[in-house]
């Protein structure tokens, strides 16, 4: 490797809004503040909500369905 052309790779601290502190390495060189992490993200905590689109699907099918003739 060439000397003097690579960025400094230093240890930084990433702090989440929930209080979780993660130590990692980066070339950024300054500490990070995170909005969500693995401890508080809804997908990982099991608090994820499923958006109900049933009414919209029914309305679409009603609007664009072929009328049945009996």
Curated annotation (Swiss-Prot):
Zn(2+) binds at residues 16, 18, 37, 40. Its cofactor is Zn(2+). Gene3D superfamilies: Ribosomal protein L31 (4.10.830.30). It holds the Pfam family Ribosomal_L31. Part of the 50S ribosomal subunit. Belongs to the bacterial ribosomal protein bL31 family. Type A subfamily. HAMAP family: Ribosomal_bL31_1 (MF_00501). This is Large ribosomal subunit protein bL31. It comes from Glaesserella parasuis serovar 5 (strain SH0165). The lineage of its organism: Bacteria, Pseudomonadati, Pseudomonadota, Gammaproteobacteria, Pasteurellales. The gene is rpmE.
């Amino acid at each position: 490797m060439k000397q003097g052309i690579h960025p400094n790779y230093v240890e930084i601290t990433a702090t989440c809004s929930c209080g979780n502190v993660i130590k990692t390495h980066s070339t950024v060189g300054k500490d990070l503040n995170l909005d969500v992490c693995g401890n508080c993200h809804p997908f990982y905590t099991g608090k994820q909500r499923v958006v109900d689109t049933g009414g919209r699907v029914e309305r679409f099918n009603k609007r664009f369905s072929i009328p049945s003739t009996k």
